Amino acid sequence: MNKRWFALLGCLLFCASLAAPAQNLDAVLTSMDRAAASFHSVQTDFNADMYQKVVNEHDYQKGTMYFRKQGDSIEMAANITDPDKKYVVFSNGVVSYYQPSINQVTEYNAGKNRAEVESYLVLGLGGGGHALTNSYDVQYAGMEQVQGVSAAKLALTPKSQRVHNMFQTITLWIDPARGVPVQQRFDEPSGDYRITKYSDIRINQKLPNDAFKLKTDSHTKVVKPNG
């Protein structure tokens, strides 16, 4: 899948020892399973650091993200407030990227990749724990302090070569008390990476009525690169 998907979804878009006790990993995955069983929605603030190795540059973003799961339907929205206002919405298999500065919406249809895109959206958040082992080799890498939370660090290595070509490793820092991530890191083979920290996480609370609607007007231009 084109990396552009994940650059957008990431806006959105919330390995140490092989000898670590197996029950620790199982306990973390079980807490994630419990959280997924009752998961309907989440609102969270985020801070993201996107690093490009070839130019040795960091791109920082912050804002608020929203997730909603109804049956098999998944929606996500990211309101980026800094450094520039931008908005991303994933709904009905379509990623819509709104740039108010040029009053333009760019739409990408996930098409046959919809299920895969949705699986990344709920990675560690509403997607369950033990289900991760179907697609990843999962290692428990101990506990680390992340924004005042003692979080369980899980290192995921994709089993699929195609996914591994995009992400060498994916690391999740899980709050074991709530079974949700407080930090995620996606490492690409090129040396590029994205780290996202989540704070003020509100689970299953009422979301704004317009959380998944772009605030466009009659003059907004819509571009569809892949039809």
Q: What is each of the regions a protein language model found here?
A:
Residues 81, 99-101, 185-188:
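Beta-turn initiation residues at beta-strand->coil junctions
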